[in-house]
Design a protein with these regions (language model features):
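PRPP-associated nucleotide enzymes
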Residues: 1-151
Length: 151
């Protein structure tokens, strides 16, 4: 996707001219969008709206640092984003009350365990026994996401 800022809070999104994939090729597929940080969610919502024109099965948004404002949480609660995958790099991400309705579509990965595993491997230590629920933090067991896709 190609992004052009037309103002402080205005963004135009379109398929990049050099993209090897057209919107039509997305039909029935899972689409994953990556970003480093989200605040207001305006850009990612516009991007996902454009992608939804291709009729994908679902759109998954992966973001390293989920630091969203109230406006951002409202924007991303819309139906254009089916699931949000993020890391626990910011303490507020684990506060269910702060995330509101988004927790129904959110998966949080524990980055400290990934770092620990890499460092243990790097320094030649065996991985040893680790917690069974190694990567995910269940934001809401009452609202499981994508049961069919997760097995």
């Amino acid at each position: 996707m190609s992004k052009e800022r037309t103002g402080e809070r205005k963004v135009e999104i379109q398929v990049a001219s050099d993209s090897p994939v057209s919107l039509a090729q997305l039909e029935g597929k899972d689409v994953v969008v990556f970003d480093d940080m989200v605040r207001t969610g305006s850009t990612i919502v516009k991007c996902c709206q454009a992608l939804k024109q291709g009729k994908p099965r679902r759109v998954l948004f992966c973001v390293s640092h989920f630091y969203s404002s109230e406006e951002g949480r409202e924007n991303m609660a819309a139906g254009v984003i089916d699931e949000i995958l993020t890391l626990n790099t910011l303490p507020t991400i684990l506060n269910r009350d702060t995330q509101g309705r988004l927790r129904k579509k959110m998966v949080v990965l524990k980055i400290e365990k990934w770092i620990s595993r890499h460092l243990r491997s790097y320094f030649g230590h065996p991985s040893g026994a680790l917690a069974e629920n190694f990567y995910a933090v269940d934001m809401s067991s009452k609202n499981p996401r994508w049961k069919g896709a997760r097995g």
